[in-house]
Amino acid sequence: MAARRALHFVFKVGNRFQTARFYRDVLGMKVESCSVARLECSGAISAHCSDYTRITEDSFSKPYDGKWSKTMVGFGPEDDHFVAELTYNYGVGDYKLGNDFMGITLASSQAVSNARKLEWPLTEVAEGVFETEAPGGYKFYLQNRSLPQSDPVLKVTLAVSDLQKSLNYWCNLLGMKIYEKDEEKQRALLGYADNQCKLELQGVKGGVDHAAAFGRIAFSCPQKELPDLEDLMKRENQKILTPLVSLDTPGKATVQVVILADPDGHEICFVGDEAFRELSKMDPEGSKLLDDAMAADKSDEWFAKHNKPKASG
């Protein structure tokens, strides 16, 4: 399964300005793309698998009905880096967190230095490992070291209610390799290749709560494998959230997508690799597009003027 790749994790963000500051100034990531002009419209569907971020017509008042943006950030191109997809709905101010997303771990002494310089809260949870939070409460673990590899992002940790059941799903059905397993601590580290970001499954008691802030992890595989993957899930009576579909992006590649859910309801997007590589190329204007979008965003003022709070997700 080495042809499969870990791509990105989708976060819902309520404060786009502070979120951009965290990813750019604290972590040191670059803006890969910002799909403001193309996708900020009611009913738009992102070929990066964030269609669930759409807002219904009656969610909040004009002029922000259904208006949202998507920004990709990372330490390098998504071809060989694990990145974050930040989805922002203009009419939503915050999202309730569950216990499903447990954190992203990255190795970057520069990020630790940046956080200290900017007085961004850090808590040392192990020797040389610092816990911090992105706006919205999403946890990040910063290892105070730098690796020779190009991508500092080491792993994404998700909560599971039954580790063995989850391992059967992720390994036997999705083809991931077990890199580490600790029965006593109820954790396992999985991946598709040694040089890719890993997926860590951590057992929790009392079940997995996705709340409103639930995200989605995305992978790619050769496009020809997608129908077989969908058929396998059907045969195994596993949940398919979005059957195999082609998503068009004007002026760009058409990408095939299937969206699954694991036994705990974690959303998993698989895309056809060949077209996705074309679609996910870095946009040199990405950072400027984000800055322009934030400068033009008067939603906070509009809601305050009309004495309306932004919705809570």
Swiss-Prot record:
SUPFAM superfamilies in alphabetical order: Glyoxalase/Bleomycin resistance protein/Dihydroxybiphenyl dioxygenase (SSF54593)
Cellular localisation: Mitochondrion
Record-level GO cellular component terms: extracellular exosome; mitochondrion
Tissues with expression: Expressed in heart, brain, liver, kidney, pancreas and placenta. Not expressed in skeletal muscle and lung.
InterPro entries with a match to the protein in the record: GLOD4, GLOD4_C, Glyas_Bleomycin-R_OHBP_Dase, VOC
Keyword Phosphoprotein in record: yes
Keyword match Phosphoprotein: yes
GO molecular function, one term: cadherin binding
PROSITE patterns: VOC (PS51819)
Entry-annotated residues carrying N6-succinyllysine: K288
Highest taxon, organism lineage: Eukaryota
Keywords linked to the UniProt accession: Mitochondrion, Phosphoprotein, Repeat
Segments forming domain VOC: 5-145, 152-273
UniProt-listed Pfam families: GLOD4_C, GLOD4_N
Residue positions, PTM Phosphoserine: S146
Protein family per UniProt: Belongs to the glyoxalase I family.
Other notes: Expression is decreased in hepatocellular carcinoma samples as compared to adjacent non-cancerous liver tissues from the same patients. Transfection in hepatocellular carcinoma cells and overexpression can inhibit the cell growth.
Oligomeric form and interacting partners: Interacts with NUDT9.
Name this polypeptide is given: Glyoxalase domain-containing protein 4
Organism: Homo sapiens
